[in-house]
Amino acid sequence: MTNAFVYPNVEFIAGVDEVGRGPLVGAVVTAAVILDPHNPIEGLKDSKKLSEKKRLLLAEEIKQKALAWSLGRAEPAEIDKLNILHATMLAMQRAVENLKIQPHFVLVDGNRIPQLPMSAQAVIKGDSLVAEISAASILAKVARDQEMIELDRRYPEYAFAQHKGYPTKLHLERLAQFGVLPEYRRSFAPVKKLLSTLLSKNHEYVFKIQK
């Protein structure tokens, strides 16, 4: 995995990735991981290319073997206030700040980096090229999926365990049928549109009563 990527010549390197920019509900979750070069983990790759069972196994191994790992998040209200890009950067900052070892260098998946007190580099397709970023993507994915499973237990009619909050046909149908929960991102188009429609209908109803 790492042969194609030239690492900076420093001791502690953290990989950072996010999960949950696209869903309509819940937090955007990020992870930061500093791996131990003397305790390698086999099978690290982009979390989206792993089965759920394999992700869960690797997540436990990462937590046991990594020199440091942490999670960061930005809640739906922060996403609505800042927009999803800036909220993701904030969540990444929080993940790095939460590390018990402060890294000398941070490698971030994608083409943007958050403002950090140490040097950082964006790596396109980093979750496939850099072991630390792959590990971060796995931890973030497992954490966010677990949050969706917990939300599914509270609101089984929305089927969150199936679609994980992404705007699938099933999710949009359930959203229209059962309405907007507090955990939804109100600035996201399908949610915003539904709220606008409901508001419009309420106004019409009030107007009819007044007449």
From Swiss-Prot:
Protein name: Ribonuclease HII
GO molecular function: manganese ion binding; RNA binding; RNA-DNA hybrid ribonuclease activity
Gene3D superfamilies with a match to the protein in the record: Ribonuclease H-like superfamily/Ribonuclease H (3.30.420.10)
Reactions it catalyzes: Endonucleolytic cleavage to 5'-phosphomonoester
Family listed: Belongs to the RNase HII family.
Gene Ontology biological process terms from the UniProt entry: DNA replication, removal of RNA primer; mismatch repair
Subcellular location: Cytoplasm
EC number: 3.1.26.4
InterPro entries tied to this protein: RNase_HII, RNase_HII/HIII, RNase_HII/HIII_dom, RNaseH-like_sf, RNaseH_sf
Purpose of the protein: Endonuclease that specifically degrades the RNA of RNA-DNA hybrids.
Cofactor: record remark: Manganese or magnesium. Binds 1 divalent metal ion per monomer in the absence of substrate. May bind a second metal ion after substrate binding.
Alphabetical UniProt keywords: Cytoplasm, Endonuclease, Hydrolase, Manganese, Metal-binding, Nuclease
Broad class of enzyme this protein falls into: hydrolase
CDD domains: RNase_HII_bacteria_HII_like
